[in-house]
Amino acid sequence: PPRAQPMTSPAVTRIEVAVRPELSDARGAGVSATIRSFLGIDVGRVRTRDVYRITGELSAGEAEKVRAEFTCPVLQVSALGKLEGEHFDFAIAVGFKPGVTDPVGRSAKVAVEDTLGRKLPDRAAVYTSTLYLVDGVERDQANRIALELLANPVIQTTRIESFDEWRAAPPDLSAPVVASHDTPAVATVDLTGTDAELEALSKRKLLALSSVEMRTIRDHFRSQTSSEARRSAGLGEQPTDVELECLAQTWSEHCKHKIFNATVRYQEGEREPEVIGSVFKAYVRGTTEAVERAVIEREGRSWLVSVFHDNAGVVEHDEQHHLVYKVETHNSPSALDPYGGAMTGIVGVNRDPFGTGIGAELSSNVWGYCFASPLYSGDLPKGLLHPRRIRDGVHQGVIDGGNQSGVPYGRGWELFDSRFLGKPLVFCGTVGVLPVTVAGRPGHEKGAEPGDAIVMVGGRIGADGIHGATFSSAALDESAPIQAVQIGDPITQKRMFDFLIEARDAGLYRSITDNGAGGLSSSVGEMAEKPGGAVLDLEKAPLKYAGLAPWEILLSEAQERMTLAVTPEQIGPLLELAARREVEATVIGQFTSDGYLRVRYGGRTVGLIDMEFL
């Protein structure tokens, strides 16, 4: 029978769980079939194991208790260290890179705490990985299986060992802990260069800003009014990295839709050129307004409640409820990491109806995919995944992301065309239900006021999800950064949503929005528009780990995180409810009316941006 190999590090507890050897491993059989059909390798048997690495001190008794809790004795065997007893040709271990969200690891940490009846330290974590034991392959084939099928090098690591190498080695106790900076610092960015130098700077920092936009930012910070305000705040004429990153996010194509709003000259064949003042105004807003006029003419009233200014559209349904609907794309992230990108897409679009008005309850999801043929057999451009791998990963990510957060799927479609080889089109949509009246006020209305507290609710801030807005606004190539990809955490999001619905019905917050493509930068920046300013203290924001630079804290996005505006009178009741529901809620600043977004870190101002310029 399988036996445990002793641990070699007191700081890491390693648990390995496998299907009992006399039983069929359905997951392994599925991997084996996929290897044959996708890679054309005549592979033998594949067995799988789940590996958990728990950082932090556990006693021998505690480790054994957790091992037993993580194992179904009817179907599984497990051991502290590693299981032995099965023969195979190669072992392929697949895990996450440092800083990438590990949703199963998060849930496993909660399970460890529940099992032990005590909280683990904040710095402790559970890191998960999967071990594939493969028969009938050579080393080069094992490498292909690892890199072309089992792992995504953008977000995952692989370790490949022959049976003899694996048996001779001690248990792998390495954990993908993020290496923190010694002293997170704020840098000043020099914008005095030529247009070519400014464009190179923009590309290097993944800002997705043109040279014209870079010059505009430079000139603004040089202006007299700006300089006087900056001197009083202890800042110079050059922007800090916090300010430049915030502006790049806010001005990105992803957030500003500059192409949709630009003047377009369109000519088809020999026809006369057509000048379109704005694709958005002409074909999106214009069509909506035309339909509304027709409805008013026919029925004498409009059923549109709120369109084009909140996170999703709101239309009348009955006397008690409005319908909220939002569809968005998640193309670039799905091209890099099909499963994680698509899961992020669906849980991301979930948060838009939830952040519309004072908060809509989610009803159902929809989806639509456009890929190249899954039977494609030609060469792939560098950095691109095979269409079939993208399709299968996207579909599984969308299904898992929706169903695991309690929002079922209503309908969907797929389309295949060779033009989607370079970049897939991934639609994700959500329908929500919004009460006409909530706590004595119209459900579709919201807005922060000066003096309201800024409260961050849900998942903590990490290195993933950084530059999501600017990355998705640029052309996709092989240099795409790992930080731009975030992995959704449906369980954390579900817990947060349930808490927020309860807080909504009790009237415990005044306004809400999501931490979308720019994290706190986008949510606080958007919410500060109505009151006219905000002071945001980045040091108060809860982090997954130490060492994040201030601009990273500001920009890191997450699907399971929301920002609230809360009156001083309701802060106590809101935080008490959050504690009872085991949802993290933290006051990180205050809305003001002085016309500036002020960002603080380390007891000083590190960002001062005029709200009108932003």
Q: Residues of each region from the PLM?
A:
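Core nucleic-acid recognition elements
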Residues: 2-488, 492, 501-506, 516, ...
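Acidic/polar loop patches that form or flank catalytic/metal-binding clefts of enzymes
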Residues: 410, 510, 536, 572-577, ...
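Short catalytic-loop micro-motif centered on adjacent basic/acidic residues
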Residues: 510-513, 563
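A short, contiguous, amphipathic alpha-helix enriched in charged residues
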Residues: 528-532, 536-540
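Generic long, charged, amphipathic alpha-helical segments
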Residues: 538-549
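Repeat-solenoid scaffold signature
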Residues: 562-582
